[in-house]
Amino acid sequence: MKLLHIDSSVLGPHSVSRQVSAAIVARLREVNPGAAVTYRDLGASPLAHLSGAHLAVAQGAVPAPELQDDLAAGAAVLEEFLAADTVVIGAPMYNFTIPTQLKAWIDRILVAGKTFSYSGGTVQGLAAGKRVIIAISRGGFYGPDTPMAVGEHLESYLRFVFGFIGITEPDIIAADGIKFSPEHREKAIASALSAVTALRAA
């Protein structure tokens, strides 16, 4: 099994999403001892956001020399995603949605002809065979019956993005309400880590 591990929190060792994503990877390696893991830390080494120059190259323009390294980095993350059987993502909620670093990565893997295609006026996802497991951390509570539900643009966004490319049932493990109190933070982490142990092997 080829496993791609993505972290996007900027909090380093203080990050809950990193703690849970690491536990997920450890669990998968335990039940799949031969798994080959590729790790990308978007918080420590962020990708550049797409610009007009990137889009011009996608339309056939000759890339400027100063863009070459960035284009190579974008091609590398796309190939990492395409090669992976399972993708584990640590995704904290920042201002009601995903970190900007994770958005930059998503922009590099949503590529027509690679992860989705247009056919007959409809979109066809091309990544349907992959498994995606997302470790989510949120400071508050954003469930459907809560006052903050309208502000939930993390899990809902990621479900849509991966569904768009054919991965319609990502596994979500969430640690919610981690900013309410130190006690609740520990309880939320323990609950998430318990859910990790129940993950299916493959």
From Swiss-Prot:
Q: What is its EC number?
A: 1.6.5.-, 1.7.1.17
Swiss-Prot/TrEMBL catalytic activity:
2 a quinone + NADH + H(+) = 2 a 1,4-benzosemiquinone + NAD(+); N,N-dimethyl-1,4-phenylenediamine + anthranilate + 2 NAD(+) = 2-(4-dimethylaminophenyl)diazenylbenzoate + 2 NADH + 2 H(+)
KW NAD (keyword) present: yes
A Pfam family hit: Flavodoxin_2
As cofactor, the record names: FMN
Q: Which UniProt keywords apply?
A: Flavoprotein, FMN, NAD, Oxidoreductase
What is a GO molecular function of this protein? oxidoreductase activity, acting on NAD(P)H, quinone or similar compound as acceptor
Look up the domain of life of the source. Answer: Bacteria
- What InterPro entries does this protein's entry cite? Flavodoxin_fold, Flavoprotein-like_sf, FMN-dep_NADH:Q_OxRdtase_AzoR1, NADH:quinone_OxRdtase_FMN_depd
Q: Does the keyword Flavoprotein apply?
A: yes
Looking up Gene3D superfamilies in the UniProt record yields: 3.40.50.360
Q: Where does FMN bind?
A: 9, 15-17, 93-96, 137-140
Question: According to the record, how does the cofactor bind?
Answer: Binds 1 FMN per subunit.
What is this protein's function? Answer: Quinone reductase that provides resistance to thiol-specific stress caused by electrophilic quinones.
Description of how the protein assembles with itself and partners: Homodimer.
Query: Which family does the record claim for this protein?
Result: Belongs to the azoreductase type 1 family.
This one is known as: FMN-dependent NADH:quinone oxidoreductase
**What organism is the protein native to?**
Rhodopseudomonas palustris (strain BisB18)
Q: Which gene encodes it?
A: azoR
